[in-house]
């Protein structure tokens, strides 16, 4: 795998529109061109996990397993929802930690295809859909899985899923269900009424969430080596 990706170069943001990856002399793509990246087995892991040192999957999975231990829950009897499943890294980690079943969901069909190709058998099911829409059928579908927890590594915030997606995801969980999510700290500013910080504070005030931990950590580095920090949120759903 290393030899296959020897010529890949990371390119810093030359303009305001983000980070780039030169796959070859003739092809340069945006770092978030997920359909293109997912099309090549192992490419996402090489770029994001290895080169950019992304830690969110590990931090989210370890946090979730820590939460269920703290709550004296038995992972071997749990079905957990993984929001923004991508190629299945998080699902693989929590399954490795003893969780019986993981149901994946992602907005991109290419993510599901890559996961089924590279990590077959990790998910009990993998759905394609958008949790941010209040009119969608995805929450109804998810209620059929008797979910007992939620995990998400970097799927909420920014150009990804808005606070409404988190609220819709919480709606499919029973009271007392553990959750572990990682969110870019830029979207956790409580002074932004439309941000995740304000949304989480409101959910806590309403009794919809009980916080267990909130921790800042190094999510990854940029293509030019600068740090990007996220927050890990561990909580349980209210009743």
Please place each PLM-identified region on the residue numbering:
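N-terminal auxiliary segments of SAM/dcSAM-dependent transferases
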Residues: 1-31
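Conserved alpha-helix/loop element of class I SAM-dependent methyltransferases that forms part
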Residues: 54-76
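A short acidic, Gly/Pro-enriched loop at the edge of an enzyme's catalytic core
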Residues: 137-150
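A short SAM/SAH-binding and catalytic strip from SAM-dependent methyltransferases
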Residues: 147-162
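A short glycine-rich, Lys/Arg-flanked "PGG" loop and its adjoining helix->strand segment in the class I
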Residues: 164-175
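Conserved beta-strand signature within the Rossmann-like core of class I S-adenosyl-L-methionine
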Residues: 176-184
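Class I S-adenosyl-L-methionine
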Residues: 205-239
């Amino acid at each position: 795998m290393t030899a296959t990706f020897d010529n890949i170069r990371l390119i810093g943001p030359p303009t305001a529109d983000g980070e780039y990856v030169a796959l070859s002399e003739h092809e340069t793509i945006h770092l978030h061109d997920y359909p293109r990246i997912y099309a090549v087995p192992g490419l996402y892991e090489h770029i994001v996990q290895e080169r950019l040192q992304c830690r969110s999957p590990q931090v989210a999975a370890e946090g979730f397993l820590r939460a269920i231990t703290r709550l004296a829950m038995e992972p071997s009897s749990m079905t957990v929802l993984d929001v923004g499943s991508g190629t299945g890294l998080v699902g693989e980690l929590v399954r490795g930690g003893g969780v019986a079943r993981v149901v994946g969901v992602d907005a991109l069909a290419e993510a599901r295809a890559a996961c089924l190709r590279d990590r077959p058998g990790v998910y009990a099911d993998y759905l394609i859909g958008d949790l941010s829409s209040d009119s969608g059928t995805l929450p109804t579908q998810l209620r059929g899985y008797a979910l007992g927890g939620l995990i998400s590594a970097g799927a909420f915030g920014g150009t990804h899923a808005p606070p409404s997606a988190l609220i819709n995801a919480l709606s499919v969980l029973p009271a007392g269900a553990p959750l572990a999510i990682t969110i870019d700290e830029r979207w956790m500013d409580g002074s932004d009424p439309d941000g995740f910080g304000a949304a989480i504070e409101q959910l806590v005030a309403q009794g919809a969430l009980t916080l267990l931990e909130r921790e800042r950590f190094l999510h990854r580095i940029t293509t030019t080596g600068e740090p990007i920090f996220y927050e890990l949120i561990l909580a349980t759903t209210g009743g």
